[in-house]
Amino acid sequence: MSPMRRLLIALATATTAAALLAGCSSKDTGGPLPEAAPLVKESATTTANLKSAHLALSVTGQIKNLPVKTLEGDLTNQPTTAAKGSATITMLGSDVDAKFIVIDGDLYAAITGDDYDNFGSAANIYDVAAILSPDKGLANLLANLTDAKAEGRDTINGQKAVRVTGNVPADAVNALAPQLKATASTPATVWISEDGDHQLAQAQLSPSSTNSIQMTLSNWNAPVTVEKPAGA
């Protein structure tokens, strides 16, 4: 039985529902905006060197083959790529809250209670840990962002950031989120911290006018420990 089918069956028997909040933002003004291209380039380098972060992810609309509605958790790539947290997953018309662990490439999920099942390769469902991958994740998105334009300033989770719009080639989009199956460039907006080493505060991909994926990062490089579930 495929990992996705196993997850479908497990979710179909669950009755809990939840809603997680993504990063809060507000408008900010004042002073001329920095040039977008150098800012994005510096942020791409910083993001490629990121060792860990807290992630709040939300999906607006419906994206085929992407069951995640909201997700919140901690990611790390030290000593290996891993993640842990909770997600609201939409299946068969119902929203179900599940805790998850991604480690050694496998996805473990607890649909109800604290008993985790191994659903096999995370890449077959959604590999959230890949977001920190320098080659496939947000760093790669930034490195390939074209037509970058600084549009304004916002405050993301208390962090002042420059809002930059642009387009991301299909290859970079599909590396980050294969479920999108992009065939052309996708509009994107990124929010980059104006101070310091220009950490990426938030990114949004908009494959259509009604569908988008938003990823908000915080707690950059804070220690994160991920372990296999007991008995796994």
Outline where the language-model segments fall.
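Subset-of-secretome marker
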Residues: 3-9, 25-232
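C-terminal motif of bacterial Sec signal peptides marking the signal peptidase cleavage site
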Residues: 20-23
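Sec-dependent N-terminal signal peptides
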Residues: 10-15
